[in-house]
A protein has these predicted regions:
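Active-site-adjacent beta-strand anchor residues
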Residues: 7-8, 47-48, 74, 121, ...
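Residues at the C-termini of beta-strands that transition into short coil/loop
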Residues: 9-11, 37-39, 75, 97, ...
């Protein structure tokens, strides 16, 4: 229920969001929010911020991380886990990526028809116990998820798609369908950007093709 989830933030953000009214698919939602200085260690910390807010979030969540806390980033990209592990250790983390959702936000209103799922896994043996804990928890709450045998490949594959599609859409002011038009400049740029990610992934030992 709502009391089982707390949004932890700094004082500035708490003042900004505390009295706002939020809706999900037209239904009012009330979220429990707390200043970081008052937070207690949590069983699971979910990191869901924009990339330029990651370093600040790593500091802000320090009071929420205890001896047995599992930290799960659901951010796009391929290095948020490394940044979190550099501060708190791989023994606190699992790897995760969100996919399949079509959520759109308009101010404080969120809409979606497909909620998607979380792809979760581990890249180091010291993450195994954390992964098992999260799997049991997701099963208990009926959270849609897939346990990936090669989570790094999954993360790099989504990164490749995001880089290719987002760059092409921004450069040519088109949508996803526009990037798929064979022979178009948007399609050419999308594929070129994806090939750059493939080369980078291969250099990191990820068999992306």
């Amino acid at each position: 229920g709502p009391v089982a989830v707390t949004f932890v933030m700094d004082d500035e953000r708490l003042g900004k969001y505390r009295d706002r009214k939020f809706t999900f698919n037209g239904e009012k939602r009330v979220f429990h929010m707390e200043a970081a200085e008052n937070a207690k260690p949590a069983d699971l910390v979910i990191v869901a911020v924009k990339y330029n807010g990651l370093e600040s979030a790593i500091d802000t969540m320090s009071t929420s991380v205890g001896e047995d806390t599992v930290i799960m980033s659901v951010m796009n990209g391929i290095d948020s886990e490394k940044k979190i592990a550099a501060r708190y250790g791989w023994g606190h983390t699992i790897d995760a990526i969100a996919q399949g959702m079509d959520a759109m936000r308009f101010g404080d209103d969120l809409t979606c028809t497909h909620r998607g799922q979380l792809c979760i896994g581990m890249e180091r043996e010291e993450q195994r116990e954390n992964l098992e804990k999260v799997v049991r928890f997701f099963q208990e709450i009926h959270m849609p998820y897939t346990e990936e045998s090669d989570i790094l490949h999954r993360m790099w594959a989504k990164f490749m798609m995001n880089v290719g599609v987002n760059q092409a859409c921004a450069a040519f002011e088109t949508d996803y369908a526009g990037t798929l038009e064979e022979g178009s400049d948007a399609n050419r740029i999308m594929l070129a950007a994806m090939r750059e990610v493939i080369a980078l992934a291969n250099s990191e030992g990820i068999g992306l093709t």
